C-alpha cells in the first residue's frame, strides 16, 4: 500500500478551498445571458467551446491532490444538480463557493464548524419554503418556451421548439434530441405507439416508395413465444381472411415455414400480413406486449393466461386504425383499446416509476408511459459545424430538462431574483447561539452571489444592482441581457423552482461538508527512481600494429 500524506486543520482546508476556487472561477464565467465561453481541449479533433457549467466542471482535474479533493467536491454539486434538475449547475457552483469562502473566515476565527453547519442548514430550509411560496405553476406554451430559452443561454428558437414539442406530445410525452442533417432545427412527431422492431422479411413491404408496409384497419395478434409451425397459426389466419382485413403478428420470433407461408400469402394477395419481433427483452418484453394489448384492445396469447394460438379467436386480437412497419420501427396509430384501461395502465406504470431505484429503469418506464399516453417527438438539432452541433445539442438537452422541471414544480423569477426575495425568510431567523447566527449570515450573503456574478459577467457594477434589486419587491429585477430593471416574469426571465431549490440545497450540503473537514488524507506523489548509469564506452583500438 502506498504511503499517504495526512494534513490537518487549516492547512488541509486552505488547500481544498484553493481547489474549490479554481473550479468555481472557471465555471462561473458562463453564468447569465452575457456569460463567456470556456474552451475545452480534446485529445483528438478540434477543441469544444461551451457555456455549459457542468461540461466545464467535468473537465477539471488538478495536479495537487488536496486541491483536487476540494474541486471534486464542488464538481459533485454541479453534476448532482444537473442530474436532478437538468440545469442550475453554474448557480449551484457559485453558491457553494460563496458558502465555503465566507464559512472559512468564521472557522479560522475559532467558531464551531458544526454549529455553523446547523445555521446554514436552518437558513437553507427556510429559503426553500419561501421559494415554494414565490413559485407559480408553468402551464402555458409561452411560459414553457421562456424557460427553455433561458436554459439554452437565451436562445429563443430552442425554447420555441421545445414548447412546440411539448404541445404536440403532451407533458408526459417523450422528447428526444438527435443530430440534424440540415442547418435549421427540425421537429419530428410520431403519433401513436412506436417501438424499435421492423418487418421480418422485406417481402412484406407494400409501399415501395417509402419502403414500408402499411396496414389499414388491421387485426393485431400478440404472442410471447416463437412461431415456427404454420399449423398453429392456420385457425386464426382463416378467421382473419374471412373478415377480409390485414393482420400484424407480433411474436418473440416468426421463422421457418410459418414465415415462408405468410410471405407467400402476402405476395399472392390472399392475406395481407406483416410479422415483427416483439420489442424489448425478458420481463420488459412481457410488459411491452401487455402495453400493446391494452392499447389495441386485445390480449397477449400466452400459456400463463391459458390461451393458445390454435384456439385463438378474433375477440382476442387487438385492432388499430392504421399500422406502419418500416425496416427498424413499427408505429401503431389509433389503437382500439378502451381509454379507461389505458389510463389505468399508465397509472400503474407511474407507480413503478416512483418505486424505481435505477435511472435506466426509470427512463424505460417513462418511455412506456409516453408511448401509451402521448407520443414521441424528436428535435433534430441543425448546425454548420460539428463543434457547434455538439455545443448546441448540449444546450437543447439542458433546456429540455429545465422545462420538465418547470412543468413539475413551477417557475420563479430568474436572474438571481428568486434567491434575493427568499432572503426575507432568512433575515428573521435566529439560531441557538452566535455560531449558528453566523451560519445563517453566510447563507444570506451567498444568496446574493448568483445575481452579483450575472451582473459582473455583463460588465456592470454588481453592488449597485444588488442594492437596487433588494430594494424592489416581487418580480422586480435586473435583466442582464438588456441592462434594464423590469418585471422578470413579464420579460420572460424565469427559472424552474426545482432548479433554484436543488442548486441551493446541493451547494449547502457540500459546502457544509468542506467546512466541517478537519483532516485530509492523500497519496504521496511517487518519487521517480533515478535513471540507471549509462553503459561504458565502446572498446578502444586493440593496438595490434604489425
Swiss-Prot record:
It is found in: Cytoplasm. Residues 526-546 are annotated as: Disordered. InterPro entries: Chaperonin_Cpn60_CS (IPR018370), Cpn60/GroEL (IPR001844), Cpn60/GroEL/TCP-1 (IPR002423), GroEL-like_apical_dom_sf (IPR027409), GROEL-like_equatorial_sf (IPR027413), TCP-1-like_intermed_sf (IPR027410). The keyword Nucleotide-binding applies. It catalyses: ATP + H2O + a folded polypeptide = ADP + phosphate + an unfolded polypeptide. Forms a cylinder of 14 subunits composed of two heptameric rings stacked back-to-back. Interacts with the co-chaperonin GroES. PANTHER family: 60 KDA HEAT SHOCK PROTEIN, MITOCHONDRIAL. This is Chaperonin GroEL. It comes from Burkholderia thailandensis. The lineage of its organism: Bacteria, Pseudomonadati, Pseudomonadota, Betaproteobacteria, Burkholderiales.
Amino acid at each position: 500500500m502506498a504511503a499517504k500524506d495526512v494534513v490537518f486543520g487549516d492547512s488541509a482546508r486552505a488547500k481544498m478551498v484553493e481547489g474549490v476556487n479554481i473550479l468555481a472561477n472557471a465555471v462561473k464565467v458562463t453564468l447569465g445571458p452575457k456569460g463567456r465561453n470556456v474552451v475545452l481541449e480534446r485529445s483528438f479533433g478540434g477543441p469544444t467551446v461551451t457555456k455549459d457549467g457542468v461540461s466545464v466542471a467535468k473537465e477539471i482535474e488538478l495536479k495537487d491532490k488536496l486541491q483536487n479533493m476540494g474541486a471534486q467536491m464542488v464538481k459533485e454539486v454541479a453534476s448532482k444538480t444537473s442530474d436532478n434538475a437538468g440545469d442550475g449547475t453554474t448557480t449551484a457552483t457559485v453558491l457553494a463557493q460563496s458558502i465555503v469562502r465566507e464559512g472559512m473566515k468564521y472557522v479560522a476565527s475559532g467558531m464551531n464548524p458544526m454549529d455553523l453547519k446547523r445555521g446554514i442548514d436552518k437558513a437553507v430550509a427556510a429559503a426553500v419554503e419561501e421559494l415554494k411560496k414565490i413559485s407559480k405553476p408553468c402551464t402555458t406554451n409561452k411560459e414553457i418556451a421562456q424557460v427553455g430559452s433561458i436554459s439554452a443561454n437565451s436562445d429563443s428558437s430552442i425554447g420555441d421548439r421545445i414548447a412546440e414539442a411539448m404541445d404536440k406530445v403532451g407533458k408526459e410525452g417523450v422528447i428526444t434530441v438527435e443530430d440534424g442533417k440540415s442547418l435549421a432545427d427540425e421537429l419530428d412527431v410520431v403519433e401513436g405507439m412506436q417501438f424499435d422492431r421492423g418487418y421480418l422479411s422485406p417481402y412484406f413491404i407494400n409501399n415501395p416508395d417509402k419502403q414500408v408496409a402499411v396496414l389499414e384497419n388491421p387485426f393485431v395478434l400478440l404472442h410471447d413465444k416463437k412461431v415456427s409451425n404454420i399449423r398453429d397459426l392456420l385457425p386464426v389466419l382463416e378467421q382473419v381472411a374471412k373478415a377480409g382485413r390485414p393482420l400484424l403478428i407480433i411474436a418473440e420470433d416468426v421463422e421457418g415455414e410459418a414465415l415462408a407461408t405468410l410471405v407467400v400469402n402476402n405476395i399472392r394477395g390472399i392475406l395481407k400480413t406483416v410479422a415483427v419481433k416483439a420489442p424489448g427483452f425478458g420481463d420488459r418484453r412481457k410488459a411491452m406486449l401487455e402495453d400493446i394489448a391494452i392499447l389495441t384492445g386485445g390480449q397477449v396469447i400466452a400459456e400463463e393466461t391459458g390461451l393458445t394460438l390454435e384456439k385463438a379467436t378474433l375477440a382476442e386480437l387487438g385492432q388499430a386504425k392504421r399500422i406502419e412497419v418500416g425496416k427498424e420501427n413499427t408505429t401503431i396509430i389509433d389503437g382500439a383499446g378502451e381509454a379507461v384501461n389505458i389510463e389505468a395502465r399508465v397509472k400503474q406504470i407511474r407507480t413503478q416509476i416512483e418505486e424505481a431505484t435505477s435511472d435506466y429503469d426509470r427512463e424505460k418506464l417513462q418511455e412506456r408511459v409516453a408511448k401509451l399516453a402521448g407520443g414521441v417527438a424528436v428535435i433534430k438539432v441543425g448546425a454548420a459545424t460539428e463543434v457547434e452541433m455538439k455545443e448546441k445539442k448540449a444546450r437543447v438537452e439542458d433546456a429540455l430538462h429545465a422545462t420538465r422541471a418547470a412543468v413539475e414544480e413551477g417557475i420563479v423569477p430568474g436572474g438571481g431574483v428568486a434567491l434575493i426575495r427568499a432572503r426575507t425568510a432568512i433575515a428573521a431567523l435566529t439560531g441557538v447561539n452566535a455560531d449558528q447566527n453566523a451560519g445563517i449570515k453566510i447563507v444570506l450573503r451567498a444568496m446574493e452571489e448568483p445575481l452579483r456574478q450575472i451582473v459582473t459577467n455583463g460588465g456592470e457594477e454588481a453592488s449597485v444592482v444588488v442594492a437596487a434589486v433588494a430594494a424592489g419587491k416581487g418580480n422586480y429585477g435586473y435583466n442582464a441581457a438588456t441592462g434594464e430593471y423590469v418585471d422578470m416574469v413579464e420579460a420572460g426571465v424565469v427559472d424552474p423552482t426545482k432548479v433554484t431549490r436543488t442548486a441551493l440545497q446541493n451547494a449547502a450540503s457540500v459546502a457544509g461538508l468542506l467546512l466541517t473537514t478537519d483532516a485530509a488524507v492523500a497519496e504521496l506523489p511517487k518519487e521517480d527512481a533515478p535513471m540507471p548509469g549509462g553503459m561504458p564506452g565502446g572498446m578502444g583500438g586493440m593496438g595490434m600494429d604489425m
